Amino acid sequence: MDVDVKRLCVRIMLSVLLLLGLAACNDRRPLPQGDTYVIRNDGGGQLISAEADRAVLRLWSGPVEIEGYCNSACLIFTTLDNACLDPELILGFHGANITVGFVGNPQVSKYLRNGIKQKFDDEWQHIPFTEIHRITAQEYVALDPQTRICS
C-alpha cells in the first residue's frame, strides 16, 4: 500500500474516532456565567461528560454550589476546591453500569477523598447501578472533612 494511502486511512480512522468520542459526550452541563455556578438536582449522566465539565469548573475557579440532589457522576464535583455543598443536599452513590479497567468505578473513585473514597471503594461501588445509596451533606462532610458546607 502506498504511503499516502496509508496516511489517508489513518487520518480517516482518527477522524471517525474523534467524532465517536464527541458523540459520546452529549450531556454536557452549561458553561459558567455570572458569579456563582449552581449544580442543582443533577442525576449524574455520562461520566466522560462530567469529567469534561469538572475540568471547566476547576479552571474557571469561581464558586460552585451543589444543591438539591447530586447522584452518580455528579459526585465528582464535590471535591472541587471551589465547591461547597448546600446543607440540604442529598448525595447518591452506586456502582457503574460498565467497569472495565480504568473505566467506570475507578473513574469515579479517583475524584473522591478520605472516608468517602473508602466507603465507595469498599461498599458503594458494589451497589447495582439500578439502585442508589443516599447520604446527607452532613454525613458526606463527616467522611470527607475537606469538603465544605455552603454558608
Task: Place the predicted regions along the sequence by residue.
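Gly/Pro- and small hydrophobic-enriched strand-loop and loop-to-helix capping segments
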Residues: 82-104, 149-151
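Charged, glycine-interspersed solvent-exposed loop segments at helix/strand-loop junctions
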Residues: 36-39, 52-61, 102-151
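Surface-exposed patches in mature extracellular/periplasmic domains of secreted proteins
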Residues: 64-69, 87-90, 122-127
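Sec-dependent N-terminal signal peptides
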Residues: 12-20
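Bacterial N-terminal signal peptides that target proteins for export
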Residues: 2-13
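N-terminal secretory signal peptides
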Residues: 26-80, 145-151
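C-terminal motif of bacterial Sec signal peptides marking the signal peptidase cleavage site
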Residues: 22-24
